C-alpha cells in the first residue's frame, strides 16, 4: 500500500488490457484467403462437427475462423471477410467468417436473424 507522498510522486501504474482479437490489429474486419476448410469437435458436454477454416489474413497472419450457419460454399482458395468473436465450445477459435460477403454465400432458406447470416429477404 503506497503512501500519499508516493502516489503524488509516482502515481498508479495503468493495467495494460490485451486485445481479444490480436490478428485483426485493431480493425473491425480483415480480408483473408482460406488455406484449409475442415471440421472440429466441440468441448465436453457438446457433440457436433463444427465447420472451421484456416485463413491467411491480408496482413500475413494465419488464424482459425468459425463458419457460422447451416451449410457453406467455402473451398481452399475462397476469399473471406473475418471478424472477431470467439466460439465458446471450440477452444482456440477467436474469429468468425462473415456470411454473404466476398466469396462466402449467405445461408439458404433463413427466415430469422437474416442479417447475421447474409440471407436475403424471402419472397412473399
Swiss-Prot record:
PROSITE patterns: RIBOSOMAL_S12 (PS00055). One of its GO terms (cellular component) is small ribosomal subunit. It comes from the Bacteria. It holds the Pfam family Ribosom_S12_S23. GO terms for molecular function: rRNA binding; structural constituent of ribosome; tRNA binding. GO terms for biological process: translation. Residues 112-124 have a biased composition (Basic residues). Residues 104-124 are annotated as: Disordered. Keywords: Methylation, Ribonucleoprotein, Ribosomal protein, RNA-binding, rRNA-binding, tRNA-binding. The modification 3-methylthioaspartic acid is found at residue 89. With S4 and S5 plays an important role in translational accuracy. PANTHER family: 30S RIBOSOMAL PROTEIN S12 FAMILY MEMBER. Belongs to the universal ribosomal protein uS12 family. Part of the 30S ribosomal subunit. Contacts proteins S8 and S17. May interact with IF1 in the 30S initiation complex. This is Small ribosomal subunit protein uS12. It comes from Pseudothermotoga lettingae (strain ATCC BAA-301 / DSM 14385 / NBRC 107922 / TMO). The lineage of its organism: Bacteria, Thermotogati, Thermotogota, Thermotogae, Thermotogales.
Amino acid at each position: 500500500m503506497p503512501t500519499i507522498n508516493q502516489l503524488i510522486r509516482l502515481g498508479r501504474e495503468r493495467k495494460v488490457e490485451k486485445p481479444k482479437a490480436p490478428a485483426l490489429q485493431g480493425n473491425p474486419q480483415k480480408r483473408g484467403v482460406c488455406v484449409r476448410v475442415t471440421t472440429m469437435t466441440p468441448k465436453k458436454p457438446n457433440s457436433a462437427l463444427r465447420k472451421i477454416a484456416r485463413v491467411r489474413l491480408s496482413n500475413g497472419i494465419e488464424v482459425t475462423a468459425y463458419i457460422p450457419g447451416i451449410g457453406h460454399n467455402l473451398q481452399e482458395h475462397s476469399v473471406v471477410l473475418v471478424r472477431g468473436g470467439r466460439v465458446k465450445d471450440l477452444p482456440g477459435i477467436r474469429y468468425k467468417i462473415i456470411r454473404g460477403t466476398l466469396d462466402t454465400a449467405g445461408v439458404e432458406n433463413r427466415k430469422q436473424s437474416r442479417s447475421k447470416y447474409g440471407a436475403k429477404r424471402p419472397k412473399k
